[in-house]
Amino acid sequence: KYKLNMILAGVEDAPLVIDELAASEIPVIINPMDNIPDSFDELSSSLELSALLSNAGITVLFDTSRSHNYHLIRQGAGNAVAYGMDYLDAIAGLSTNVANVFGLKDRGSITKGHYADIAIWESDPLEPASIPSYIFINGIESDLTTRSSRLKDRYIKKLDKK
């Protein structure tokens, strides 16, 4: 009737209604590391939730629940893989699923005609210690130099002279 595009966030109790949720085709946003039930509505919290939802055919998007922890989102996706989620489904939870759910169909994947935003990683992007080697935004390489990297380079040179 109202043509709403619904998205559910949290859904720690999703295992209780997994069949109904899958049939509804409503995407969910979860924190894959939120496994401590700290309220009544989170009693079913589990590290396996990401895999359970994804394996049931539910579109999963990841968040960190707190903006100051956003740097942990890749680690959360990695934890989801460690607890049974398919690796490519976890990557999609950070990219393609997000773009599709929010109506950005020309983003989120490496496809001809899409915006050319891409990060090339030195190793597995779901490993917390991994850093991007290159980032391209709209097809243009971004400078990854930071104050920290300049300081590192400066002091490494001083150590090398000794």
Locate the predicted segments by residue.
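Active-site-adjacent beta->alpha loops and helix N-cap segments on the catalytic face
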Residues: 13-24
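C-terminal cap of metal-dependent C-N hydrolases
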Residues: 112-155
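Short glycine-enriched loops at secondary-structure junctions
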Residues: 12-14, 66-67
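His/Asp/Glu-enriched, well-ordered alpha-helical/loop segment
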Residues: 22, 27, 31-35, 39-121, ...
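Short acidic, glycine/serine/threonine-rich loops at helix termini
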Residues: 20, 72-75, 131-132, 147
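Polyanionic/metal-chelating signatures
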Residues: 1-6, 17, 131, 137, ...
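Catalytic beta/alpha-barrel core
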Residues: 5-13, 33, 37-39
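Charged, amphipathic alpha-helical linkers/stalks
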Residues: 158-159
